């Protein structure tokens, strides 16, 4: 959080999202967030959310949900969007998110089902689409891209992870966004210029 704030202050075109990732809750500092949420360069709270990939016992779930809710409430208080991390936790994520009205933001690196995607879109959320959409076996993500209106899809990286084909296994960078855009255009059977301008 401190590094991203310093980077944003040094560069005019760089803005910051601050927050505590669900796997970094040992360092959770709500006071820090309150002190910096209104900094000129802070535009969102994130990545925040739930991650049950490595540990899905009841204690882990309980430990992650409260900080997630506190960060959402802070975002609402200061009218900031949220960037949500949801890994192997899509139903709990939706249950938390749907308990708040006027919450806006995106689901980073969306990997849930089409049915869940529709529920999040109904709440006004954007769905992050990254390099995974280019993977041969990414049928669920491709189904989401095909069936969700383009205006709800947000092209992104998960740098340095999940580089698109043919760069899979390499360090991911924002220079690969055009590859993701081409795949989205192909799946939706539209021109890439439509993807670029939506």
Predicted regions and their residues:
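Mid-domain alpha/beta scaffold segments of enzyme catalytic cores
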Residues: 1-198
